[in-house]
Amino acid sequence: MTLNLRVMTPNRTVWNSEVQEMILSTNSGQIGVLPNHAPLLTALDIGITKIRLNGQWSTMALMGGFAMVDNNQVTILVNEAEEAAGIDPQEAKETFRIAQTNLARAEGKKQVIEANLAFKRAKARLEAIDATLSYASN
């Protein structure tokens, strides 16, 4: 038995296929979704989503949004999403380094909030790459 997963941003459909299971990063922690999961509507935090398809795990960086699970259909609406395989590791590391520096130097409430958001996005992209590399080494 499988789940039908659709991941959509305002501009495109990032993923649209059947999967065996997935792990979502919600605002209150991670949640696993298997076939026949109870209906659910949840906010998604900036973080990674792990997807198992044909026994292999894939990872995607999601930049906040919502997920709805109902009748083996999972619909994810996010501001932005990137599959780990499409993220340039060098660029992601550099973006993370810059985000760390900007967060440390941020002054004033607005600057701190913006720097923290950029840091969380950069961290999610790096975590997606790291998770994919750990799956490949197992």
Swiss-Prot record:
<comment type="subunit">
    <text>F-type ATPases have 2 components, CF(1) - the catalytic core - and CF(0) - the membrane proton channel. CF(1) has five subunits: alpha(3), beta(3), gamma(1), delta(1), epsilon(1). CF(0) has three main subunits: a, b and c.</text>
</comment>
<dbReference type="GO" id="GO:0045259">
    <property type="term" value="C:proton-transporting ATP synthase complex"/>
</dbReference>
<keyword id="KW-0139">CF(1)</keyword>
<keyword id="KW-0472">Membrane</keyword>
<keyword id="KW-0813">Transport</keyword>
<keyword id="KW-0066">ATP synthesis</keyword>
<dbReference type="InterPro" id="IPR020547">
    <property type="entry name" value="ATP_synth_F1_esu_C"/>
</dbReference>
<keyword id="KW-0150">Chloroplast</keyword>
<dbReference type="InterPro" id="IPR001469">
    <property type="entry name" value="ATP_synth_F1_dsu/esu"/>
</dbReference>
<dbReference type="GO" id="GO:0005524">
    <property type="term" value="F:ATP binding"/>
</dbReference>
<dbReference type="InterPro" id="IPR036771">
    <property type="entry name" value="ATPsynth_dsu/esu_N"/>
</dbReference>
<dbReference type="InterPro" id="IPR020546">
    <property type="entry name" value="ATP_synth_F1_dsu/esu_N"/>
</dbReference>
<keyword id="KW-0793">Thylakoid</keyword>
<dbReference type="Pfam" id="PF00401">
    <property type="entry name" value="ATP-synt_DE"/>
</dbReference>
<dbReference type="Pfam" id="PF02823">
    <property type="entry name" value="ATP-synt_DE_N"/>
</dbReference>
<keyword id="KW-0375">Hydrogen ion transport</keyword>
<comment type="function">
    <text>Produces ATP from ADP in the presence of a proton gradient across the membrane.</text>
</comment>
<keyword id="KW-0406">Ion transport</keyword>
<dbReference type="GO" id="GO:0046933">
    <property type="term" value="F:proton-transporting ATP synthase activity, rotational mechanism"/>
</dbReference>
<comment type="similarity">
    <text>Belongs to the ATPase epsilon chain family.</text>
</comment>
<keyword id="KW-0934">Plastid</keyword>
<dbReference type="GO" id="GO:0009535">
    <property type="term" value="C:chloroplast thylakoid membrane"/>
</dbReference>
<protein>
    <recommendedName>
        <fullName>ATP synthase epsilon chain, chloroplastic</fullName>
    </recommendedName>
</protein>
